A protein has these predicted regions:
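Polysaccharide-binding surfaces and accessory modules of carbohydrate-active proteins
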Residues: 5-101, 124-156
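Active-site-adjacent structural elements in folded domains
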Residues: 1-7, 98-99, 185-193
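Substrate-binding groove/exosite segments of carbohydrate-active enzymes
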Residues: 151-211
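Short Pro-Gly-centered flexible turn/kink motifs
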Residues: 29, 103-121
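Active-site catalytic microenvironments for nucleophilic, acid-base chemistry
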Residues: 66, 118, 211
Length: 211
C-alpha cells in the first residue's frame, strides 16, 4: 500500500513526493520504486531532447539534467533525488529520466521516504537545495509549514450558504486555485492557464484583494 502527498516548498524551487509505503502482506518484501520524468527544458520535446545532458552524482544522490544548447538557460539544472539511497538510474534514454530506490519491509511494517524534483541555477544553489532537503524530518517540517501557510491564508474569508458544495468551493478551493495557478505560477495540475495580459492580471489580483 502506497500513499503519496505532493507539495511545493514555500521558499525553494523544489517539489516533494512524500511517500508512505506499507507491506500489507504476511511475508517480508523487498520493493523497487522508480520515479521518472519526461524532461523538455525548451520550447518542445522534439527540438530539445537531443541537447539534454543527464548526469548522475553519487555524492548528491541525484541525477542532474541540463540543456547544454540553450544559451539563455545554460546554467539552469533540473534534478531528481530521494531521501533513500538511489540504487539505479536511467539517464541515457531520450524519452525519460528516472531514479530507483529499494526498500525492504517486514510484514505490516511501514516506512516513509520522499522523491524530490527541483531546479537550480548554478552548482552552488543546486548543492544547497539538494543537501537542505535530503532528510525526511526536514521534508516533514516543510510540509507542516506549507499546510499552516495555506490554512492561514485561505481561512481569511469564509462564506456559509445552504449549498454545501458551494461552500466547499468558495471556502478555500477557488481562492487557492487563483493564487497558486495565477499568481504563484502559470499552470496547475488540475487547471492549466494564467494569462500575462494586463486585464487578466488585474482580474486575478482583484479576487484576492481582501486576502
Amino acid at each position: 500500500d502506497l500513499e503519496t502527498i505532493q507539495f511545493v516548498s514555500k521558499i525553494d524551487k523544489i517539489k516533494f513526493y512524500k511517500n508512505k509505503l506499507t507491506n500489507v502482506t504476511d511475508k517480508k518484501k523487498k520493493y523497487k520504486i522508480s520515479f521518472w520524468i519526461n524532461p523538455t527544458l525548451g520550447p518542445n520535446e522534439e527540438k530539445s531532447s537531443r541537447y539534454l545532458l543527464s548526469e548522475y552524482f553519487e555524492n548528491l544522490n541525484a541525477i542532474v539534467i541540463r540543456n547544454v544548447y540553450n544559451i539563455d538557460f545554460s546554467g539552469v539544472s533540473v534534478f531528481l533525488s530521494s531521501t533513500l539511497p538511489i540504487s539505479n538510474v536511467s539517464i541515457d534514454r531520450i524519452i525519460y529520466k528516472s531514479i530507483t530506490v529499494e526498500i525492504e519491509l517486514e510484514p505490516n511494517e511501514t516506512k516513509e521516504f520522499s522523491f524530490m524534483l527541483g531546479t537550480a541555477i548554478g552548482k552552488e544553489e543546486l548543492n544547497k537545495i539538494i543537501f537542505n532537503y535530503n532528510q525526511d524530518k526536514v521534508i516533514d517540517k516543510e510540509y507542516q509549514d506549507v499546510v499552516k501557510y495555506w490554512d492561514n491564508m485561505l481561512n481569511t474569508i469564509k462564506v456559509k450558504t445552504p449549498d454545501i458544495n458551494f461552500n466547499y468551493m468558495m471556502n478555500g478551493w477557488y481562492l487557492y486555485q487563483t493564487i497558486a495557478s495565477r499568481l504563484f505560477a502559470r499552470a496547475g495540475f488540475y487547471q492549466v492557464g494564467g494569462a500575462y495580459g494586463f486585464r487578466d492580471q488585474l482580474q486575478d489580483s482583484m479576487n484576492i484583494c481582501e486576502v
